[in-house]
Amino acid sequence: MRGIHAEGVVTESGFTVMKGSMVRNHEAAYAAKAILDFRHQCLNDGTIVDWVLTRDVDFNSPSTAATFLFGSNASGPASWKNAEGISMLKLDKVESGAMESTSSEYTGFFKTVEGNEGSKCHYPTRLDTYGCGCGHDCSYCYAKDMITNLSGAWDPIHPKYADIKRIETKLKKVPKGTILRLGGLTDCFQPIELQRRVTLETIKLMNRYGIGYLIVTKSHHVADQEYIEVMDPKLAHIQITTTTFDDKLAAKYEKASPPSLRVAATEKLQALGFDVAFRLSPYVEGWIDFDSLNQVKCDKILVEFLRVNPTIINRFPVQESDFPIHEAGYFHMSLERKLEVLSKITGFKEVTVCDDNSEHYEYFRDHFNPNPNDCCNLRIITE
């Protein structure tokens, strides 16, 4: 394997433990010596504090890293666990950033989504400025459901935040003109942003490197003056999400900005000429007043229909019978019902649908969406 300079690295059975952001994979012939050298360094060098294992697992100390690596039994890496007792098998199943150390830093902030969702999304690479929790804590959130079930690491009160220096290290490697989604597992404008400003600083960096950013948020703060002054209209794409126009109803199931403020933020950004879309996500039966929806002053709307699993059904007021189609662990509404809903949306110049069900995705791509190759329908400005 090719070697790249790093302060310290060891590879065993395909898993790499490293210090720093650069990786050096040892040739097989030198692996045994590398492991011994690493073990000696871990146990004797008290200055090593940021050894990590690929799969985005942090260790609190060099001794923890050494214990993880050398505590495996005959079952090999599949039996290994990190300091929190999470097995490698679960780490392979969970999205990047779901497993973190006990520190406040969020290291799994950069992820290219694969699988069912990744194969359909035109912008599969996401940058989460915050992770392992979201202050909006929506009842229907699939990321919350996934992380809670696999690791119990979801903490909406104390979410973790990415280090801006590490973000810049990643962004330097991203080709100019790429569009990254800001906020994949969590909302990049959740309440902690008003304290940490990681998203604000990330936007500044993306401007510097000519990288586009697709912001998906339930917060009205994206239209605050300090963000308006920073966002580049050629690079910024904003989608502001709501599920209802009833502020009281929304407050029962999410801790985001009141929908009335989100509508105002959408209309403000539209008037300023930004590429903005009103995002009905997810659409929940009986929650939307279509008269109010069609009065929103925005050219574009994106619709994403609620998908559920047994956990979401148990904590959310929906009827299982309304979701007759099963795919990839989720239950979906019928295509006929989705089309009925879409026929009521008349107040926007362009309506597009984001859908994870394969059959429905293909239908909307081929027969409905204005941009077949991009269900987000972004306005791309080329110089």
Residue ranges of model-derived segments:
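Intrinsically disordered, charged low-complexity linkers and terminal tails
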Residues: M1-A98
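Conserved Radical SAM active-site core
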Residues: A98-H237, F245-K248
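Auxiliary Fe-S-binding modules of radical SAM enzymes
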Residues: A98-T102, D291-E383
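Hydrophobic faces of well-ordered beta-strands that scaffold small-molecule active sites
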Residues: T125, T178-L180, Y213-I215, I238-I240, ...
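Active-site beta-loop-alpha junctions enriched in small/polar residues
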Residues: L185-D187, K218-H220, T241-F245, S281-E285, ...
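Surface-exposed amphipathic alpha-helices with a cationic face
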Residues: N207, I228-D232, V263-G273, S343-K349
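Glycine-enriched alpha-helix->loop->beta-strand junction motifs that scaffold or abut catalytic
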Residues: D232-I238, V296-I301
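Conserved strand-turn element in the central/C-terminal portion of the radical SAM core barrel
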Residues: E254-K255, A265-I288
